[in-house]
Regions:
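Transmembrane helical cores of multi-pass ion-transport proteins
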Residues: 1-424, 468, 489, 521-522
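Conserved SAM-binding loop
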Residues: 73, 506, 531
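Generic hydrophobic alpha-helical segments
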Residues: 84, 164-167, 460, 464, ...
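Active-site donor-binding loop signature of nucleotide-sugar glycosyltransferases
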Residues: 231, 450, 534
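Short secondary-structure boundary/hinge segments and terminal tails
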Residues: 290, 331, 515, 534-535
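The feature marks cytosolic C-terminal regulatory regions of anion transporters and related permeases
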Residues: 360-525, 543-546
């Protein structure tokens, strides 16, 4: 049960004052980094700015306290922005709350059922494809604010394609003042990390953006122009629940759960490499579930482990969950004291921050490398996941991407299964290699290589017997697995052979195929004496058969 033990309990056993100081310092620095990001991601998700802070506070605290990683920092992430925006637009905040709670329940169940290790079975091409697709949707969604565009009344695009069309159709309404603020903010975000190692570039960009709007004659929309800002602490809210609402929320909940699991465990793996540690994936999933449930009930949005914030925590000395807890407490203080000033942040600055977030998450170098080096089947899955994410949504991308990946994998595996006949030789055959074994004319040997499953069962049809054949030997030393479809094909082969008076002998059947054969009663059908441990014994048995 150690896999379901919070890392906080383990960390406290050897905790000391020196590490506490490092954790507090790291927690405060990460909170400063998380502040502008949480606000920007909340706005990109179609909710109020305080919802992002609530998420970082509530989910961040719960996930740090219960998590299976000693350094994970959780909060709102860019991966959820387009999903959340779509849910809010269609189902409202109550729909989002229900979907997030259900996702939290799914995550808890995944952890309790020890599904943590199963996440690795999601292909890398799918995660790369939809991550790059999300980055593109974020950029397209922020073009309006970056250029200060004005849309006609009633035009509120939801889908990415609709947003792009609206940008193109209304580009003539560009606000040069907004473009100047956005361009300066973007330049600061790019240059600041090279100059200021400790101060996050997003915070510097926010301060400069506020100063530009407040002290220069620039007509630019700010958060305060579009949203009501509150510095009140998160309060408990339980939405009205009905069977129909829950049923409608299930697909979105599943997507949120899968994405939260993937991103949080990926963050844990990256963190393990940085601190030479090992996380508890099952406990991390339980914590992610509890954190998302708590976040939804206290006015937040979906949360998961954030790689950038986790890396910042590690680089600043954080080594235990105390750093994550301090990060949440610091954000509570910031919420109460500084939140009213958030209304002064220009929208183009928010857009610029999200452009950088999108760039950092798009993995374009990995994308290009896969296109150049990956097999064609993987490239198909990569582009399918990418395009479907941009044109539709993440639900469609993951579902179709997984189905496509499975089908292409089945095709690839079926191509690795071969049935080859041994070369028949006798004393009258000229130029015979010495290593070839001479066999009587009545014995025919086939060697099967690769997994025998439904995608490769048809290869058994390649086994051909002659009129003079009295014994067929099937060498299966290279068959690691057998399923019911292939088992049925073998039964058909044996029955056809028996009808022709041909005995079938099996050589070197591995453990898994043998279990399937025994369970299906196949060993009784063939006869246990016709299952031999190696080819020499099988050929000896074949000679006994033709001698009878």
């Amino acid at each position: 049960m150690n896999s379901l033990k919070p890392m906080l309990l383990t960390s406290l056993k050897s905790y000391n004052r020196s590490q506490f100081i490092k954790d507090v310092t790291a927690g405060i620095i990460v909170a400063i980094i998380a502040l502008p990001l949480s606000i920007a991601l909340a706005l990109a998700s179609g909710v109020g700015p305080e919802a992002g802070i609530f998420t970082a506070i509530v989910a961040g605290f719960v996930i740090s306290a219960l998590g299976g990683s000693s350094v994970q920092i959780a909060g709102p992430t860019a991966a959820f922005a387009t999903i959340v925006a779509g849910i809010v637009a269609k189902d409202g905040m109550d729909g989002l709350v229900i979907a997030t709670i259900l996702a939290g329940i799914f995550l808890v169940l995944m952890g309790l059922c020890h599904f943590g290790s199963l996440i690795k079975f999601i292909p890398f091409t799918i995660t790369t494809g939809f991550t790059s697709g999300i980055a593109v949707t974020i950029v397209i969604g922020q073009l309006k604010d970056f250029f200060g565009l004005t849309y006609p009344d009633g035009v509120k695009p939801i889908e990415t394609t609709e947003k792009f069309r609206a940008v193109v159709e209304n580009f003539s309404t560009i606000n040069i003042d907004a473009l100047i603020v956005g361009a300066v903010s973007l330049a600061v975000l790019i240059i600041a990390p090279y100059i200021f190692k400790r101060i996050p570039g997003s915070l510097i960009a926010v301060i400069i953006g506020i100063l530009m709007v407040q002290f220069l004659p620039l007509k630019v929309s700010t958060i305060g122009n579009l949203y009501t800002i509150s510095n009140s602490l998160p309060s408990f809210h339980l939405p009205a629940v009905s069977f129909e609402v829950v049923q409608n929320a299930l697909p979105n909940a599943f997507t949120i759960a899968v994405l939260a699991a993937i991103e949080s465990l990926l963050s844990c793996v990256v963190a393990d490499g940085m601190i030479n540690g090992k996380h508890r994936s099952d406990m991390e999933l339980v914590a992610q579930g509890a954190g998302n449930i708590a976040s939804a009930l206290f006015g937040g949005i979906p949360a998961t482990g954030a790689i950038a914030r986790t890396a910042a925590n590690i680089k600043n000395g954080g080594r235990t969950p105390i750093a994550g807890i301090v990060h949440s407490i610091t954000l509570v203080i910031v919420l109460v004291v500084l939140m009213p000033y958030a209304g002064m942040i220009p929208m183009p600055t928010i857009a610029a921050i999200l452009f950088i977030v999108a760039y950092n998450m798009c993995q374009w170098r990995t994308f290009v490398k896969l296109v150049k080096t990956a097999p064609k089947s993987d490239i198909i899955v990569l582009f399918a996941s990418f395009i479907l994410t941009v044109l539709f949504d993440l639900v469609v991308a993951i579902e179709i991407g997984m189905v496509l990946a499975c089908l292409l994998f089945i095709k690839r595996m079926s191509e690795e299964t071969h049935v080859n006949s041994w070369t028949y030789v006798d004393d009258d055959t000229p130029d015979v290699d010495e290593h070839l074994q001479k066999l009587p004319l009545q014995i025919r040997v086939y060697e099967i290589s690769g997994p025998l499953f439904f995608g490769a069962a048809s290869t058994i049809e390649h086994i051909v017997v002659k009129d003079f054949t009295t014994c067929l030997v099937l060498r299966m030393r290279s068959v690691p697995a057998l399923d019911s479809t292939a088992m049925n094909a073998l039964v058909d082969l044996v029955e056809v052979c028996e009808s022709k008076g041909i005995t079938v002998v099996f050589s070197h059947v591995n453990e898994q195929p043998m279990k399937v054969m025994e369970k299906a009663g196949f060993t009784k059908l063939v006869g246990k004496e016709n299952f031999q441990p190696n080819i020499s014994a099988a050929l000896k048995r074949a000679e006994e058969v033709i001698a009878e």
